[in-house]
C-alpha cells in the first residue's frame, strides 16, 4: 500500500521515515541495523502455460506440458544467473505449481508462479525484461504457449546514514549499548522502500527470539514471536521519533538565528 499512500500525500512535509520488521534470528532486546540496502528488490512472476494435451502413453502427440513446465522451472533461474553479475544476487524461486487432474492424462494447461529477487537495484531494472525473454525462449522448443504476468514489485529498502545513526542512538538509550547488531541485506522485499525513494529514513530488524527459543524463519507456520518484542519495538520507534523531532527543531532554530549560533 505504500505507493497508494504516497500518491495520496502521506509524505507531504515529512522530512524522514522509519520502520521496523520482526526478525526471528535476532534476540529479544536487540535490533538489527545496517546503512545502505537492508532488503532486496522483489517481483512476482505468474506463468500460464497451454498446449495440446493427451494420453501419457502418447506424449509425442502432445506438447507434454508438464515436462515443459519442469524445464521452465529449472532452466529460467539457471539462465538468469548466467546472464547477470553473480554479485547482484538474482534469485528466482517458485511457490506455486499446478497442472493436471489425472495420472494418465497430459494436461492442456498449467500454472507456475514465484518471485524474482535481486540485491542490486540497477540489475533488478535490467533483469525484468530479461526474465520475460528467457521464459519465452525456454518454452519455444516444447511448443507450449507461455503467457507471462510479470508484476514489478519493490526496489530495495536503502537506509540512509543520518537516519540510521538516529535510530541506533535511540535504541542504545532505551535498550543499552549492546542492543545493536549488524544484519546482512535480506533477500526479502518491503514496500517501505518506495517511501525511502521519496525521503531519507531507516528500517530496523526487531529481535523476537526469546532466550532458549529455536530460530525460525518468518514464514514458518510455527513461528511464534515473543510478545515482549511489541513493547520494545514501541519504545525504540517512539524514542527515534523524538530524536528526529528534536533534530528538526534544532535545525530550524539554527536557520532562524545563524549569527547567534555562530557566536556560540
Q: What are these language model-derived features?
A:
Residues 1-107, 189-190:
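Histidine/acidic-residue-rich, glycine-tolerant segments that coordinate divalent metal ions
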Residues 67-264:
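Metal-dependent amide/peptide-bond hydrolase catalytic core
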Amino acid at each position: 500500500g505504500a505507493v497508494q499512500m504516497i500518491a495520496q500525500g502521506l509524505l507531504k512535509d515529512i522530512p524522514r521515515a522509519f520502520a521496523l520488521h520482526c526478525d526471528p534470528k535476532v534476540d529479544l532486546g536487540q535490533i538489527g541495523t545496517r546503512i545502505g540496502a537492508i532488503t532486496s528488490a522483489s517481483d512476482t512472476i505468474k506463468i500460464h502455460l497451454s498446449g495440446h494435451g493427451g494420453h501419457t502413453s502418447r506424449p509425442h502427440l502432445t506438447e507434454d506440458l508438464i515436462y515443459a513446465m519442469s524445464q521452465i522451472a529449472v532452466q529460467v533461474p539457471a539462465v538468469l544467473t548466467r546472464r547477470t553479475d553473480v554479485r547482484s544476487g538474482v534469485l528466482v524461486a517458485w511457490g506455486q505449481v499446478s497442472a493436471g487432474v489425472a495420472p494418465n492424462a497430459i494436461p492442456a494447461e498449467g500454472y507456475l508462479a514465484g518471485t524474482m529477487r535481486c540485491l542490486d537495484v540497477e540489475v533488478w531494472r535490467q533483469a525484468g525484461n530479461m526474465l520475460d525473454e528467457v521464459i519465452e525462449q525456454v518454452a519455444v522448443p516444447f511448443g507450449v504457449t507461455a503467457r507471462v504476468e510479470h508484476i514489478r514489485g519493490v526496489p530495495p529498502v536503502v537506509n540512509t546514514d543520518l537516519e540510521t545513526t538516529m535510530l541506533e542512538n535511540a535504541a542504545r538509550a532505551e535498550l543499552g549499548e549492546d542492543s545493536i547488531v549488524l544484519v546482512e541485506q535480506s533477500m526479502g522485499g518491503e514496500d517501505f522502500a518506495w517511501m525511502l525513494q521519496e525521503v531519507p529514513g531507516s528500517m530496523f530488524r526487531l529481535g523476537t527470539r526469546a532466550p532458549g527459543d529455536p530460530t525460525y524463519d518468518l514464514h514458518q507456520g510455527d513461528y511464534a514471536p515473543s510478545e515482549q518484542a511489541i513493547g520494545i519495538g514501541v519504545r525504540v520507534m517512539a524514542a527515534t521519533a523524538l530524536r528526529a523531532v528534536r533534530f528538526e527543531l534544532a535545525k530550524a532554530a539554527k536557520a532562524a538565528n545563524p549569527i547567534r549560533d555562530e557566536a556560540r
